Regions:
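Short metal-binding segments enriched for Cys and/or His
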Residues: 10-32
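Extracellular/lumenal glycan-associated surfaces
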Residues: 42-54, 72-84
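Short linker/helix segments within small regulatory modules
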Residues: 1-11
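Short, recurring structural edge motifs at helix starts
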Residues: 29-38, 49, 59-67
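Short hydrophobic alpha-helical runs that function as membrane-insertion/retention elements
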Residues: 159-167
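Short, low-order "capping/linker" segments at domain edges
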Residues: 173-190
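Polyanionic, low-complexity intrinsically disordered segments
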Residues: 80-156, 192-226, 231-233
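Extended, charged low-complexity segments
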Residues: 229-254
Length: 254
């Protein structure tokens, strides 16, 4: 840091000042609040009955069987042959207020979006359509919809994030097949775990050779997600609580 670093429009001449600024930024609220809690969604069984997919008797039989199997209701109905995968997925999408996809062309998740693989895996959102001009991305996600993950991605990237529900097997294959688009503005770095004390080191690295850095952060999964951007590169840093062990290669459970 012989020449200092410009972070979010301000100049910091020393490592100590940069560290203090990064910590102060993390202490600020991570964007707009989630807003008031929505009304509880209709239960899946009620929706399937309303859509005339199952009868009341079939629902009761599935609930009775569920007590022994421990399966989710949708999985139980499919196992009993009472509802198709698409019927269950459609009802789950209505329940969440989003669209759904019964299948996904794997070519759409390769080289389409610049998000790093580790960020995608940790958030559990698989990009399959990206418009850099409209700053809009479509992502595949499984039920139940994790709105906190969607908000975190939107806050980190400043993109409009449109979630689409898919079945668990479709999501798993899409996740393992995802490859990022190589950005013309520089490499998309995989997410890196760090403590709050180490964050300034990452800021200094992204700012190498005098490149100004923009820092944004979002709270998700009991951690703070930080995106550092310069004209040189983009880096995602997950600031974990003290004592937390870094594990960034496992997909988020849904």
């Amino acid at each position: 840091m012989a020449r200092g670093v410009r972070l979010n429009g301000s100049w910091y001449c020393s490592r100590e000042c940069l560290d203090a600024a990064a910590r102060l930024s993390l202490a600020q609220p991570a964007g707009a609040p989630a807003g008031p809690a929505p009304l509880p969604p209709l239960r899946l069984g009620v929706l399937l009955r309303h859509q005339r997919v199952i009868t009341g008797g079939q629902l009761q039989a599935a609930l009775d069987e569920q007590r022994f199997s421990g399966l989710k209701l949708g999985t139980q109905l499919r196992a009993l042959g009472m509802a198709s995968s698409e019927a269950v997925l459609r009802a789950l999408a209505v329940q969440s207020g989003v669209s759904y996809l019964s299948s996904l062309d794997l070519a759409r998740v390769r080289g389409v979006c610049p998000l790093p693989v580790a960020t995608v895996r940790a958030l559990g959102l698989v990009p399959f359509d990206f418009d850099p001009f409209e700053r809009r991305v479509s992502v595949a996600i499984t039920a139940p919809l994790t709105r906190a993950a969607v908000r975190a991605m939107a806050m980190l990237t400043q993109w409009t994030v449109e979630p689409f529900l898919v079945d668990d097997p479709v999501w798993s294959v899409a996740l393992s097949s995802y490859r990022p688009l190589e950005s013309a503005d520089g490499p998309a770095w995989a997410a890196t775990a760090a403590s709050a004390r180490e964050l300034a080191d990452h800021v200094a690295a992204v700012a190498a050779d005098g490149h100004p850095v923009t820092m944004r952060h979002a709270a998700y999964d009991q951690r703070t997600w930080v995106r550092l951007e310069s004209s040189r590169e983009t880096r995602d840093v997950i600031v974990r609580p003290e004592g937390d062990v870094a594990c960034l290669v496992q997909p988020t459970a849904h």
